[in-house]
């Protein structure tokens, strides 16, 4: 039986990646530091996924094992050495922390003279996630290790899309997900061409698809979350019923379509993107998905990053002379967002009260364009004054 190692036994790992790998006949080794989850996986070797729709459905995922990388790192290294594929869904900020372990797994494959090619795929909400991980892994490799990596280890970028709300169940492993799911892998970066995963779309150029997803789903979800928080809503579904919040979402979508059509006219049409964006609205409005605003709005500093879901579109729309007023408006709401249980929100509010505003904008967004910085400064002040 083919073996898969998956880092991250959280909701996306179990509720999406694990489902696809299991359907493709893989024995799956989940790697995580959550002892309770890992122990449960090793006791039951299976779990159920619930599909949150008008016609509820349960899917069984089996052939599973768990490895606690905090307690048993050597077992992770051995699992990577024996694996046919390695995947990850742990969050962009955590990727650097597993790089050394992945490097040791690659070194063990080299020591055992394994000449079977393998792909290591980061399934994260970021552009170039696998390439980013590869650079971090390379920091722990010798020159000869790097030659082996170049010949036998692929790091194809990927885009994943499925809404998995925050949830708690008596069954530790049970997870509820929306019906929609999409996993796209950059075929041009794949090393192991001996199999293709059913349920995965392969593209020769991933960039247009990952930008469509990040600038539509992630930017859109965040638009609803920060707009809902500003209006005092706690649940995404409730916020979306407010006409101003729906209007904000549609405004961001309109600007996103303009950018995608300007960048990728050979991949998308206005009609395609309109249909895609209408589908996204219906996904956010799924009455069976009760998603908390705080989950979607968490880590506001990260979401204000230079290559993230608002600042990157703003930069690229500005370069093309296209409107980005709706994106800019949400940036103002992100700076106004307050959640005492979110360390980044607390940190951002502290900096707003102590730092020069333009300097703070430069620090958080990485921007140097004075025009955009000034526009962000004005919209921050607008929401600061409105909240008084």
Curated annotation (Swiss-Prot):
A single BP term in Gene Ontology: mannitol catabolic process
Reactions that this protein is recorded to catalyse: D-mannitol 1-phosphate + NAD(+) = beta-D-fructose 6-phosphate + NADH + H(+)
Binding-site positions, NAD(+): 4-15
Entry GO CC: cytosol
InterPro entries given in the database record: 6-PGluconate_DH-like_C_sf, 6PGD_dom2, Mannitol_1_phos_5_DH, Mannitol_DH, Mannitol_DH_C, Mannitol_DH_CS, Mannitol_DH_N, NAD(P)-bd_dom_sf
Pfam families for this protein: Mannitol_dh (PF01232), Mannitol_dh_C (PF08125)
EC number(s) reported in the record: 1.1.1.17
GO molecular function: mannitol-1-phosphate 5-dehydrogenase activity
Keywords annotated in UniProt: NAD, Oxidoreductase
Sequence similarity: Belongs to the mannitol dehydrogenase family.
Protein name, UniProt field: Mannitol-1-phosphate 5-dehydrogenase
UniProt lineage: Bacteria, Bacillati, Bacillota, Bacilli, Lactobacillales
């Amino acid at each position: 039986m083919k073996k898969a190692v998956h880092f991250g036994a959280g909701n996306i790992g179990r509720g999406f990646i694990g489902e696809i790998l299991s359907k493709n006949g893989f024995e799956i080794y989940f790697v995580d530091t959550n002892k309770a989850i890992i122990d449960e996986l090793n006791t039951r070797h299976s779990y159920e996924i619930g599909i949150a729709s008008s016609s509820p459905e349960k899917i069984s995922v089996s052939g599973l094992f768990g490895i606690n990388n905090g307690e048993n790192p050597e077992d992770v290294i051995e699992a990577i050495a024996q694996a046919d594929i390695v995947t990850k869904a742990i969050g962009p900020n955590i990727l650097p922390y597993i790089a050394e372990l992945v490097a040791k797994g690659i070194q063990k494959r080299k020591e055992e003279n394994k000449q079977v090619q393998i792909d290591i795929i980061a399934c994260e909400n970021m552009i170039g996630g696998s390439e980013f991980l590869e650079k971090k892994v390379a920091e722990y490799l010798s020159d000869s290790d790097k030659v082996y990596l170049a010949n036998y280890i692929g790091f194809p970028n990927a885009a994943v899309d499925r809404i998995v709300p925050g949830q708690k169940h008596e069954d530790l492993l049970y997870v509820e997900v929306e019906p929609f799911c999409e996993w796209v892998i950059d075929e041009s970066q794949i090393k192991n061409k001996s199999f293709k995963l059913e349920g995965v779309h392969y593209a020769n150029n991933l960039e247009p698809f990952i930008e469509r997803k990040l600038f539509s789903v992630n930017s859109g979800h965040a638009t609803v979350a920060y707009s809902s928080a500003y209006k005092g809503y706690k649940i995404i579904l409730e916020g979306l019923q407010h006409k101003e919040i729906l209007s904000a979402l549609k405004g961001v979508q309109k600007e996103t379509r303009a950018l995608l059509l300007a960048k990728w006219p050979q991949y998308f049409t206005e009609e395609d993107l309109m249909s895609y964006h209408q589908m996204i609205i219906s996904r956010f409005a799924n009455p069976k998905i009760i998603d908390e605003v705080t989950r979607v709005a968490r880590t506001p500093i990260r979401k204000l990053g230079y290559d993230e879901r608002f600042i990157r579109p703003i930069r690229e729309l500005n370069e093309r002379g296209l409107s980005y007023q709706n994106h800019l408006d949400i940036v103002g709401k992100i700076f106004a967002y307050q959640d005492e249980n979110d360390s980044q929100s607390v940190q951002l509010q502290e900096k707003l009260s102590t730092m020069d505003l333009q300097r703070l904008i430069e620090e958080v967004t990485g921007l140097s364009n004075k025009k955009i910085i000034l526009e962000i400064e004005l919209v921050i002040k607008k929401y600061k004054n409105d909240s008084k």
